[in-house]
From Swiss-Prot:
It comes from the Bacteria. The keyword Membrane applies. Signal peptide: none annotated. The lineage of its organism: Bacteria, Pseudomonadati, Campylobacterota, Epsilonproteobacteria, Campylobacterales. Keywords: ATP synthesis, Cell inner membrane, Cell membrane, CF(1), Hydrogen ion transport, Ion transport, Membrane, Transport. The gene is atpC. It is found in: Cell inner membrane. This is ATP synthase epsilon chain. One of its GO terms (cellular component) is plasma membrane.
Length: 123
């Protein structure tokens, strides 16, 4: 299976880069998945969690909002704010706290924020 290249960038710099099997993005019209060979598109992202599936594990990045450019072999995400939540990391609890704060500050839609926060807490 061919791998998809992904990069997640915020104004302060790069948050994540790598080759992955798939990505699930929080689009404004709902979540959508991307595999290698996906159609080209540019879309607006809402506050949510970017789910990244690598060869060995799933990784998660909370974003407050941004844009994604998808081509058949790569996904480039430009987000206003992002927090990488790495499983097994010593600072995972701190990352989850920062992700919650980022999302709470991102939207006044409490229902949408609470569903994303529930997803983060289940990681």
């Amino acid at each position: 299976m061919a791998l998809l290249k992904i990069s997640v960038v915020v104004p302060e710099g790069e948050v994540y880069t790598g080759e992955v099997k798939s990505v699930v993005l929080p689009g404004v019209e709902g979540e959508f998945g991307v595999l290698y060979g996906h159609s080209n598109m540019i879309t607006l992202l809402q506050a949510g969690v970017v789910e990244i599936e690598t060869e060995n594990q799933k990784e998660h990045i909370a974003i407050n909002w941004g844009y994604a450019e998808v081509t058949n072999e790569r996904v480039d995400i430009l987000a206003d704010g992002a927090v990488f939540i790495k499983k097994g990391s010593d600072d995972r609890d701190d990352a989850i706290s920062r992700a919650k704060k980022l999302l709470e500050d991102a939207s006044s839609d409490r229902l949408a924020v609470s569903s994303v926060l529930a997803k983060i807490e289940s990681l």
